[in-house]
Amino acid sequence: MSVMFDPDTAIYPFPPKPTPLSIDEKAYYREKIKRLLKERNAVMVAHYYTDPEIQQLAEETGGCISDSLEMARFGAKHPASTLLVAGVRFMGETAKILSPEKTILMPTLQAECSLDLGCPVEEFNAFCDAHPDRTVVVYANTSAAVKARADWVVTSSIAVELIDHLDSLGEKIIWAPDTHLGRYVQKQTGADILCWQGACIVHDEFKTQALTRLQEEYPDAAILVHPESPQAIVEMADAVGSTSQLIAAAKTLQHQRLIVATDRGIFYKMQQAVPDKELLEAPTAGEGATCRSCAHCPWMAMNGLQAIAEALEQEGSNHEVYVDERLRERALVPLNRMLDFAATLRG
């Protein structure tokens, strides 16, 4: 059974688009960042959804491009004393939870996530208090405070396996915050899930009619879908999975043309994986609507070269991530449970 809970959330105002840099300015900041990374004994960790030039810089400087969990794991294992996290705020918090001894910097602490914003801790605590018999499972896309309330943290790459495991133990679940991913997991496992109703502003915009028209235009294309997308979009997919799983699917599918329903930032690494294949963006407009995100997270776009240089140079309250130690210790428990469970899956 899956029962939906819908918090009263407002439509989130988007941040202003960063001012474009000239070619000369980009070259200046790239060299400055490379120098500052060496001087600070720092390493860049960037999410798949950041802009291509940011991912490229992370590659060139020995950093990491991955999903939020692997970003934090990479940072925890890396000998650098400072981590520059190019992503959104919960990713910086997760890095700090796993690496409290390190300095965690972000280009801006104003880089939000609609899933995080849609799950305020006070309301979530009250929701959990009303259902004390349920195991609390929260998606990685949540604040440190919400993680601290959870029994488990989960990423999309192991969500089905974890919920299937908990269901086999007879446990009833509270799932937060992504309703689409929650529905997908419930359908795959049959688990008893009480689901918080949040959504990713990017994946929530994919449209079935527009996708159908694109599929008709390219009938030889496979459709790759992130499970944060609406159920109707997921049902059209040839492959469903997390960011890393979609990149893997792009390599294994025989199709030479791929329609990709996730943030277009993933195209940088996906195209590297399948250089001979054509990648098409799944449509986010149509059916009488225009897109707001247009397949790219506006907060991810805040991770620009100038902001990265400023973070490495200025530090301070505008760039450094802090997590209260007692909160960090509580949030670390469900995170470590997830890491241990993921290790068993890898064998």
UniProtKB/Swiss-Prot annotation:
GO biological process annotation, one example: 'de novo' NAD biosynthetic process from L-aspartate
EC numbers for this chain: 2.5.1.72
A family per Pfam: NadA
One Gene Ontology term, aspect cellular component: cytosol
Keywords assigned: 4Fe-4S, Cytoplasm, Iron, Iron-sulfur, Metal-binding, Pyridine nucleotide biosynthesis, Transferase
An example Gene Ontology molecular-function term: metal ion binding
InterPro entries named in the record: NadA, NadA_sf, Quinolinate_synth_A_type1
Cofactor: [4Fe-4S] cluster
SUPFAM superfamilies to which the protein is assigned, alphabetical: NadA-like
Function according to Swiss-Prot or TrEMBL: Catalyzes the condensation of iminoaspartate with dihydroxyacetone phosphate to form quinolinate.
HAMAP family in the record: NadA_type1
PANTHER family associated with the record: QUINOLINATE SYNTHASE, CHLOROPLASTIC, QUINOLINATE SYNTHETASE A
Protein name: Quinolinate synthase
Organism: Escherichia coli O127:H6 (strain E2348/69 / EPEC)
